[in-house]
C-alpha cells in the first residue's frame, strides 16, 4: 500500500510540475505579465511542490492562485519552509554551569532554519 501511494505521488508530482512547466514555456510568453506577487505563481508552485510534496504543495499553490487577483494582495510572498522536518533540541541557558562545555567551541548548525533554507534553494 505504501509503495502504491509513493507511485501515485510521483506520478502526480510529475503531472503538476510538467503542467506548470508547459504554462511557463508556452502559455505565459503569449499573455501579458499578470502575477501580482514575487516569485511568480508558477515559480511558487514549483518550489512548493519540491519542498512540501504533492498534497501540501498543491494546496499552497491553490491558496496562492486564489489570492492573485486585482482585489487580492501583492508583493513578496515566498514559499514557507517545511518546518515539520526539523529536529529540535533544548539547550540550557547556562551550559558551563552544568559542565557541558569548557573553552571555546564553534557550533556548526546542520539542521537549523538557515541551513535548511540554503539546502532547499540548491534543490530548486
UniProtKB/Swiss-Prot annotation:
Keyword Kinase: no
HAMAP family xref list: UPF0161_YidD
GO annotations of cellular component type: plasma membrane
Subcellular location(s) per record: Cell inner membrane
Major localization class: membrane
Pfam families per the UniProt record, alphabetical: YidD
Function description: Could be involved in insertion of integral membrane proteins into the membrane.
Name of the protein in its database record: Putative membrane protein insertion efficiency factor
Entry annotated with the keyword Cell membrane: yes
Topology relative to the membrane: Peripheral membrane protein
Family membership: Belongs to the UPF0161 family.
Matches recorded under InterPro entries: Membr_insert_effic_factor_YidD (IPR002696)
Keywords (A to Z) from UniProt: Cell inner membrane, Cell membrane, Membrane
Residues that span the membrane, as ranges: none
